[in-house]
Curated annotation (Swiss-Prot):
GO terms of biological process kind: 'de novo' IMP biosynthetic process
SUPFAM superfamilies according to UniProt: PurM C-terminal domain-like, PurM N-terminal domain-like
Species assigned in the record: Pyrococcus horikoshii (strain ATCC 700860 / DSM 12428 / JCM 9974 / NBRC 100139 / OT-3)
Enzyme class (EC, first level): ligase
Entry's Gene Ontology cellular component terms: cytoplasm
Protein name: Phosphoribosylformylglycinamidine synthase subunit PurL
Residues that, per the record, bind substrate: 77-80, 99, 224, 296-298, 511
Residues annotated for Mg(2+) 1 binding in this entry: 76, 509
Known EC number: 6.3.5.3
CDD domains assigned: PurL_repeat1, PurL_repeat2
Gene name in the database record: purL
UniProt catalytic activity: N(2)-formyl-N(1)-(5-phospho-beta-D-ribosyl)glycinamide + L-glutamine + ATP + H2O = 2-formamido-N(1)-(5-O-phospho-beta-D-ribosyl)acetamidine + L-glutamate + ADP + phosphate + H(+)
Pfam family, one: AIRS_C
Keywords, alphabetical: ATP-binding, Cytoplasm, Ligase, Magnesium, Metal-binding, Nucleotide-binding, Purine biosynthesis
Amino acid sequence: MFPQEEKLIRERLGREPNDVERAMLEVMWSEHVSYKSSRKWLKLLPTKNEHVVLGPGEDAGIIKFDDKTWIVIGIESHNHPSAVEPYGGAATGVGGIVRDILCMGARPIALLDPIRFGPLEKEKNRYLFEYVVKGISDYGNRIGVPTVGGETEFDESLDNYTLVNVACVGIMKPEHLVHSYVTEPGLKLIIVGNRTGRDGIHGVTFASEELSENAEEEDRSAVQIPDPFTEKLLIEATLEAVYTGKVRALKDLGGGGLTCAASEMVGKRGFGAIIYADKVLLREPGMTPLEVMISESQERMLFAVRPEDVEELARIFEKYELEWSVVGEVIEEPKFIVYWKGSKVAELPIDLLTEVPTIEWPMKEYKIEEEVGIPRISLQEAFEKVWRSPNIVAKRWIWEQYDHEVQGRTVVKPGFDSAVLKINEEYGIAITADGNPNHCYLNPYHGAMGLVAEVVRNLVSVGAKPLALVDNLNFASPERPEVYWSFAETVKGLADAAKAFNLAYVSGNVSFYNEIVDKPIKPTPVVAGVGKVKLSKIPKGPNKGDVVTLVGETKRELGGSELYRVLGIRKGIAPRVNLEVERKNAESILRLINASLVSFVHDLSRGGLLVALAEVAALFNVGMEVTIKTDMNPVEFAFSESHGRYLVVLPERKLEEAREITDLKVIGRIIGSNSFSVKINDEVLLWNLDKLKDVYWNTLYRLMD
């Protein structure tokens, strides 16, 4: 807390808070819990459309899939913990977002993991990468929730640090909805799951400040300990309890522990709570009430239940061999009172915990965009560098550690523009996640707009109609004027783009203070999207003889591109989005797919056209012959990251009909031979298909050996 906040608290209370109260207030007034620096700006985001059942404000958002099925989605970051202890930090990040989905009354069915690291040439970055992936893999596999997609990026600005964002999707019936807040007094508050220990104490305050050079030693105790086996039992027990209709409210004990879960649960509708902290089951001897109230031990849920229903639910918990205890009750008076062995150890007005004043930090606009000349490099040399980039090559080294088919719903697997999960015999959902800190660093507003556009392109490329979005905003300290300005610009860009597509943000997360030893990260918003797809219409893949076509205009837009990154060029102008064109092209692609006119569609984004072509060849083991005439420099045309573009592969006999829907420029053909050949004006790129595939599929393995 800042000195002026402490002064405000003393004035409200008319006294100094005691140690327990101070610890609880520090948790609730932390940036991580209160969103005090971001709340004002987040109000700009659209949160309603015809698909939204429940927008931001609870643990996850809910979208209507059909009359019998709702989709639940949320996203969280676990950046600081993963930078300090990558295995435990990443694993508990998975556990936390899964419980957020669970406490709405939904079964978690899939995970996405947008993760970012420093360059793999450094041993520390390889260590963070290896153990973050292992943490996500072990936890997800053991609880039986598949990790079906995400994205992985390596950038110099993240040296010795990591950004670990995890999104989770769940499925539920409308009648099973449980809210995270109570609507009546007299309810009993029950903690179910793991015993409470000293792990994760001050976790949210540690996540609300920059990391020091010695963070690995100093902050390890703030990282929670993962226990996926208990989580698996907790999922089944919680759902069985929810299906009885006897659960009045439900919260995950995550950041801020019991203090946060209980105060938010009762405070939303103006109720209060009495907590008997000595009734909490402990894992370690000698714990104090302060430690009990702010511990962030994992795999714990807080149930609000009428007194007459406690016994019935307890039988369910015991059936799954989960420990439980009644730790408090909901009261009419808006106070949060804590007892320890008969003595009152804390008493605070509930709104002092839950209604934290906003902060508006000073802002300073920065302008770093400037025109950069076209690099003097051949098409062959440029492709050699970009195609070998860890940001471009296949992430199979990661997927192979994940069980992405558990639960049997996965229709389109990792490695494509979106993953697709079967919901019923006819329809499924497509899910995807995207970030682009290089574009957002050059221009936060246009970079953020481009991000939403890319999510839409990824969804429609598999035939899905976009329904809703969630956002995870990773930034450095808001106390830096340039950072706070870039945050506000990012939110404006996310809002304007979503409105253009009539999309709403149903949930989200803000993670500030992502910097280590005074080195701030680039603005890194991540957007995940969900869409509805008819399973029979998903494009299956290219066939020999198909024509390769391009939809959308390629412009002179290399700023923030992967080509510039591998060449060490940090300047440039970020690509601009024409929202009208983007929307029109997305609608056209959906029409092409629904009319069964195409074999395959791939969005153009990182790496540009040449990378998209090579990805199709490598993914499907097909030869390709491409010839392009342009008034642009061949390297610029090949690696521009202009928005609004798609590769569309289709049988030649369907070309005429497809052109009635949209303008398709034929640039090449799928061939039977073992070659990947691209000619742009007079420059020729020729690769053997086996070599192309070897680089794509095996580079990450070689880097991690």
